[in-house]
Amino acid sequence: MPKVGMQPIRRQQLIEATLAAINDVGMHDASIVQIARRAGVSNGIISHYFRDKNGLLEATMRYLISHLGLAVKSRLLNLTENTPRARLRAIVQGNFDDSQTNSAAMKTWLAFWASSLHSPMLHRLQQVNDRRLYSNLSVEFSRCLPKDKARIAAKGVAGLIDGLWLRGALSHNVFNCEEALSITYDYIDQQLTHA
């Protein structure tokens, strides 16, 4: 009989083991056996909690997306000024948070993006995440720019976030957060000078 309260602990262990396995060997080679071994549980536990490897990958992506949301939210809540510039910078900072730019997270995001082209559930998660970023950026830009310009500026910032993040992920070096923030802040400032 399973111990009461173990489900959240086991799920977290398996998600962390999945991140570690993808970081070390890639998603394709991260087998259920290997992930279970890393988590110190039997293979059957993965089936019990997640159905299969796809279910575990989906849960892992939800975990990363949840941490992304928390990173953005905490920065927005800690702002001392409520200006569009400050709020846009907070959104960017959250997207470049260590929870999203550490090696395991970056490799898992890359695998997720590639897999989302072939998995309807992962594609839906990717679309929700994309829309949330675009919507948050659009709302802030629309506080001081006409709607059409706000949308274009939001696409530009989202493109910079994704592009800088992707270049960082593919470089095999530690992500240069300060450089990414500086480039993105400059773009935001350029857009806001037209307000």
Curated annotation (Swiss-Prot):
Domain of life: Bacteria
Gene3D superfamilies: Tetracycline Repressor, domain 2
The keyword Transcription regulation is assigned to this record: yes
Segments forming domain HTH tetR-type: 8-68
Disulfide links within the chain: none
DNA-binding region boundaries: 31-50
PROSITE patterns assigned: HTH_TETR_1, HTH_TETR_2
One Gene Ontology biological process: glycine betaine biosynthetic process from choline
Alphabetized GO MF terms: DNA-binding transcription factor activity; transcription cis-regulatory region binding
Family annotation (InterPro entries): BetI_C (IPR039538), DNA-bd_HTH_TetR-type_CS (IPR023772), Homeodomain-like_sf (IPR009057), HTH-type_TetR-like_transc_reg (IPR050109), HTH_TetR (IPR001647), Tet_transcr_reg_TetR-rel_C_sf (IPR036271), Tscrpt_rep_BetI (IPR017757)
The entry's keywords: DNA-binding, Repressor, Transcription, Transcription regulation
The keyword NADP appears for this protein: no
Pfam family of the protein (one): TetR_N
The protein's annotated pathway: Amine and polyamine biosynthesis; betaine biosynthesis via choline pathway [regulation]
Known role: Repressor involved in the biosynthesis of the osmoprotectant glycine betaine. It represses transcription of the choline transporter BetT and the genes of BetAB involved in the synthesis of glycine betaine.
HAMAP family from the UniProt entry: HTH_type_BetI (MF_00768)
NCBIfam families in the record: betaine_BetI (TIGR03384), PRK00767.1 (NF001978)
The protein's name: HTH-type transcriptional regulator BetI
